[in-house]
UniProtKB/Swiss-Prot annotation:
It comes from the Eukaryota. GO terms for biological process: DNA damage response; DNA repair; response to ionizing radiation. Its main location: nucleus. The gene is INIP. It is found in: Nucleus. This is SOSS complex subunit C. One of its GO terms (cellular component) is SOSS complex. Pfam families: SOSSC.
Amino acid sequence: MAANPSGQGFQNKNRVAILAELQEKRKLLMQNQSSTNHPGASIALARSPLNKDFRDHAEQQHIAAQQKAALQHAHAHSSGYFITQDSAFGNLILPVLPRLEAE
């Protein structure tokens, strides 16, 4: 089979773009690390918890939306009953199973 030269060119351009982006991020991280020795670093450090809180809140909203969608899908396509609860295994919803007494 002959290789597609234009496909390889696209892959190479994509790789170059990814590498350039990674180098830029690395450069910014290095600058942030070097700025911790300067008095202005406290401003940058003070912002990071706010960004983390914002990301955590956004992630929680995304998970809540996923849980709601999974719960609605399960109720629509199953005769069982499900609840939303955090799971050690990353499940968004858990089935509720009734306990039957032994006869």
